[in-house]
Amino acid sequence: MLLAIDVRNTHTVLGLVSGTGEHAKVVQHWRIRTEAEITADELALTIDGLIGDDSETLTGVAALSTVPSVLHEMRGMFDQYWSSVPQVLIEPGVRTGLPLLVDNPKEVGADRIVNCLAAHHRFGSACIVVDFGSSICVDVVSAKGEFLGGAIAPGVQVSSDAAAARSAALRRVELTRPRSVVGKNTVECMQSGAVFGFAGLVDGLVERVRRDIDGFGAAGVTVVATGHTAPLILPETHTVDRYEEHLTLDGLRLVYERNRADQRGKARATR
């Protein structure tokens, strides 16, 4: 059983993955709040409390963190608590198999890399990957499996919360689909701006990518979405082809399997 850990700015997703290769499947997953000041000990206790007896069946761990402080503590947790379990922490220098054709590859977030890797592996085509997280990332991977870059916009919840925090007349609202695009009260107006506004943002960015990047206007390009708020926004979009709930966890599994295969190959070569 592989434990996949995806730490983002506001929330962390953990998943247990059974099987390998084409037979791999996320059998259980959790979503918890990210605590930027968490220690290695607290992180280990939290994870152990979630996975329970499954900790005895772990065959490996794959993890990423877009929060530097948590990334540091994860290294300590691995060394202290799981030193006997094979681990892959996605950071610069780790082999992913995805060439990064950008100005500074070290700037590309690990979450964006594994999402594009998983999408290309899953569909075998050029892909536009939309991740609805604390930021909305629209990333582009070529038919050859090359990361070409992307666009980043503020996320739905972050934008809604910021509007409420910076305006005396607005308050934090539940993000649900309103009755109409034309709201009849302040809450509905904010919900309309969030749901329909971000649907338009995603459609606009995807359409621009298709128009501006050679070869992406064709029918063979797959537009795939993931992320916690995707199910809220996707019904109002017209450009997204597929929704993959566990795309990031699948990408973590792929990187883990590739790095473990490399390590086994090197071990055999030295015998």
UniProtKB/Swiss-Prot annotation:
Reaction it catalyzes: (R)-pantothenate + ATP = (R)-4'-phosphopantothenate + ADP + H(+)
Keyword field contains ATP-binding: yes
UniProt keywords, alphabetically: ATP-binding, Coenzyme A biosynthesis, Cytoplasm, Kinase, Metal-binding, Nucleotide-binding, Potassium, Transferase
A GO-annotated cellular component: cytoplasm
Record: residues binding K(+): 131
Pathway info: Cofactor biosynthesis; coenzyme A biosynthesis; CoA from (R)-pantothenate: step 1/5
Cofactor annotation: NH4(+); K(+)
Protein location: Cytoplasm
Annotated binding of substrate, by residue: 109-112, 186
Function summary: Catalyzes the phosphorylation of pantothenate (Pan), the first step in CoA biosynthesis.
Subunit structure: Homodimer.
Protein name: Type III pantothenate kinase
Source species: Mycobacteroides abscessus (strain ATCC 19977 / DSM 44196 / CCUG 20993 / CIP 104536 / JCM 13569 / NCTC 13031 / TMC 1543 / L948) (Mycobacterium abscessus)
Gene: coaX
